[in-house]
């Protein structure tokens, strides 16, 4: 790696540590030419493939924005949204694929959101799954009730 100070083409790794809950590696480096130290952060790139075929980097902030809209007027704090976004990223990364279709990101949001706030879940699901009638909402509410009963038993 080039030194950012003198542009020397090589550097030595002095220390490496995991950061961001294991999603990145922070490396402390030293330049043999000028002797200065600098830090680099390495992350595995995770890309989302949209329906149009366009690829963009995965963004926790985008997940939070979408879920925050569904949570508008609900008692959901920023810490819960950040935790949900981390769960979504972990689920998407667990697929092992460097490129994930956008609909898989949406599916990864639904589970944690259902556990966080059922009303926000219904709002998000209605847009994500393109509900077009009251019957669509009724079916989803029945599925929520069934999930709640199964969760209560275990």
Swiss-Prot record:
> Which function does this protein serve?
Negatively regulates transcription of bacterial ribonucleotide reductase nrd genes and operons by binding to NrdR-boxes.
InterPro entries per the UniProt record, alphabetical: ATP-cone_dom, NrdR-like_N, RNR_NrdR-like
Domain ATP-cone, by residue range, is 46-136
The lineage, from the top, is: Bacteria, Bacillati, Actinomycetota, Actinomycetes, Mycobacteriales
The similarity comment for this entry is:
Belongs to the NrdR family.
* UniProt cross-references to HAMAP family, sorted A to Z: NrdR
- Taxonomic source organism: Mycolicibacterium gilvum (strain PYR-GCK)
Q: How is the cofactor bound?
A: Binds 1 zinc ion.
Gene name, Swiss-Prot/TrEMBL: nrdR
Gene Ontology annotations of biological process type: negative regulation of DNA-templated transcription
- Source organism superkingdom: Bacteria
* Record NCBIfam families: transcriptional regulator NrdR
The positions making up the signal sequence are: none
Q: What is this protein called?
A: Transcriptional repressor NrdR
- GO MF term (any one): zinc ion binding
State its cofactor. Answer: Zn(2+)
User: Zn finger regions (unnamed) covering which residues?
Assistant: 3-34
Q: Which UniProt keywords apply?
A: ATP-binding, DNA-binding, Metal-binding, Nucleotide-binding, Repressor, Transcription, Transcription regulation, Zinc, Zinc-finger
